[in-house]
Amino acid sequence: MSGRGFSRGGGGGFRGGARGGRGGGRGGFQQRDMGPPDTVLEIGSFQHDVESEMLCSLTAPTKIPYFNAPIYLQNKTQIGKVDEILGPINEVYFTVKMEQGMLASSFKKEDKVYISGEKLLPIERFLPKPKVAGGKVEKRGAQGGRGAPRGRGGAGSRGGRGGFSSRGGPGGRGGARGGAGGRGGFSSRGGGAPRGRGGFRGRGQ
């Protein structure tokens, strides 16, 4: 990926938001495609090809494309569909799985790609919701004390993991997941960098 990878900062809540967006995108494609739309909007610019797919940077900063949304040229010729969405909130990329007969390597850097306006979601759908201060948060924190009776929270109970064990009770487990969500960025497939694509992660589960 030419040195590009995920940013650990730059916005939170993308892990859960991206999955919700994927579900919405799939729901929109239950019906058969009815040909090109009346109008298309610029959605990205081509950066380079990756394993026969196009890697594009998002040029519509307030919109996120559906997964599997058709991608067009300006003349409404369909060239592929959105395959993956990658990166943090301030530097979003997406890949395009090519239609039969189309070659990602035939495009030039910064060539524009287009999408139907009906296949876009507002970026607010992927932003973290404000935390609500109150008794509920305190109750969840208190549950962490249950880890001690189970023997998982004590020092050295698992070969030196001590109180920092990631498996130390409901409170600890919830906290770990919350922290990971706050790192932000689209993370579709989970896990490391698949198929040799550098820092980018793959499809959603």
Swiss-Prot record:
- Give the Gene3D superfamilies listed for this entry: Probable tRNA pseudouridine synthase domain
Keyword Ligase included in the entry's annotation: no
One term of GO molecular function: box H/ACA snoRNA binding
The Gene Ontology biological process terms listed for this entry are: snoRNA guided rRNA pseudouridine synthesis; snRNA pseudouridine synthesis
Locate the region RGG-box 1. Answer: 4-28
Q: Which InterPro entries match?
A: Gar1/Naf1_Cbf5-bd_sf, H/ACA_rnp_Gar1/Naf1, Transl_B-barrel_sf
Q: Could you tell me which residues belong to the region Disordered? A: 1-38, 132-205
- The question of whether Repeat is a record keyword is answered with yes
Q: Where is the composition biased (Gly residues)?
A: 1-28, 142-197
The lineage's top-level taxon is Eukaryota
Family to which this protein belongs: Belongs to the GAR1 family.
The job of this chain, per UniProt, is described as: Non-catalytic component of the H/ACA small nucleolar ribonucleoprotein (H/ACA snoRNP), which catalyzes pseudouridylation of rRNA and is required for ribosome biogenesis. This involves the isomerization of uridine such that the ribose is subsequently attached to C5, instead of the normal N1. Pseudouridine ('psi') residues may serve to stabilize the conformation of rRNAs. The H/ACA snoRNP complex also mediates pseudouridylation of other types of RNAs. The H/ACA snoRNP complex mediates pseudouridylation at position 93 in U2 snRNA.
The name under which this protein is listed is H/ACA ribonucleoprotein complex subunit GAR1
Name its species: Cryptococcus neoformans var. neoformans serotype D (strain JEC21 / ATCC MYA-565)
